[in-house]
Amino acid sequence: MTLQRFLKEYGLFGSILLGIVAYRPLSVLSPMIPYVLMTMLFFTFSRIAPRDIRPRPIHLTLIVTQIVLALGGYFLVRYLPVPYAEIYAQAVLMCFLCPVAAAAPVIVGLLGGSIAIVTSYVVINCLSIIITGPLILGWLGHPQGTLLESMAHVLVGVLPIVMIPLLTAFGIRWKLPTLHAKVRSLSSASLYIWIFLLSLVIANTVHFVAQERHGVATMIVVLVLIGLVTCIIQYAVGKAMSRRVLGESVTIGQALWQKNSSISIWMIQSYLNPIASVSQAAYSIFQNIFNALQVIHHDRRQVREQRSIHKESA
């Protein structure tokens, strides 16, 4: 077994387990997360060409789907005759409305999907959330600060993390082709960085949940279940859309359901009841477990296919 396959098989879950068990010391390293993420994205973006980054009709479909699920889920839950219905509705809203994760292109690359389509969507979705997020939450929630301040926060929080590694990768491709070829040859770098990053993200998420002590136990359990259910719904819807449009289940699936939990948690704490952000934290843990399972399944399928080819050629 190669080192790369070993890390795909065991390193991902080991990273998740480490983040849960050692969340206190690892959460201290949380300020490193944006920089580690940008480094990981740099290696991923080195594999695509500038001409591949462009708007596509599916991007608009994804944005509309996201908003419909968010508002539909909110109003469906908001008027249920149960305690804390408004908090649960806010949690559902944000689990659907949350912008796509900047790391989505990395996972898509590991799973063999279209990095270009998802990278384009990360930028487009960020720009759309800058406008629609504060407007929707200003309507349904209790905003802190002006609309322009909220839009600026989302812009500063997301766009540089994507654009800096993207422009750096394209600049090296244009000016330093030899270096670009060397970087491109390091195809497994994203995996190694992701394993390290995953432990930090999980630790930061667990630390956040541990700090939320003001909610009753039943409410916390329901909020965690909301994170799981909305994760499964978007996973299933995204996979189905991807199969229908692209003939494969990876690209659009990841674009719809892999979320930027840090931005979402900030939006909840700025506009809604802060306890609702427990759902988003739980969503982050579930999506990373799903991602690890997907990578392992994809790797094992590739190994089986390679063995089958070798047997046929022999």
PLM features per residue range, with description:
Residues M1-A314:
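Alpha-helical transmembrane segments of multi-pass small-molecule/ion transporters
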